[in-house]
Amino acid sequence: MHAVLERVVSQMSSEVLGQNAETTQLHPNGLAYKWSAQQVVEHLVLGYRLTSSALETRLNKGRLSRKRKRTYLQWSLQLMILTFGKLPRGVPALDELMPVAGSFAAIDGQQLGNLIRQEMDAMDKLFDACRRKFGMERVAVHPFLGPLRVDQWRRFHVVHGLHHLTQLRSVIEQVAPMRVPAPIAGPTLVEKLHVPSQRPLA
């Protein structure tokens, strides 16, 4: 997997690790319209699958038409997201990327991390295939950003992933029980050997 995507996957996996399948279903403040930790992950996974489908179509059909030009709005969004790494606020997710109750089984944090890695890796293999076949040409059309090259697609998924990493962290802080801190150090050698702290005077 490309290093820039690997970093996002590792951060996501670390954030959900240790959460049980009950906690990953909880909504902040009990409000159903606020996504649970699993729903945040599902949204990302659906995005990876949608991108993978577009890449597979392009690999099967051949090059994207060079007549396909980006609009001024698409150029502006590319500048904002791909160059400055900022997602515009208030933009609703596509219907295809909205988590639907029951479409995924309830799973724990480790399984969610594995799911993110599996889907990201599958998408990245298609990025590699497109780069080999099309080079630096645009390979697929993003619904908002227009036609993108492989490097731009990777950049988008990094920015999008980091945006939802912040959301995921906030969700877990609100719904997860307090984690018990690990002991700073184990028992000392004296404690292990049961040596008395003071010896009686002779």
Annotate the PLM regions:
Residues 1-202:
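Aromatic-glycine hotspot motif
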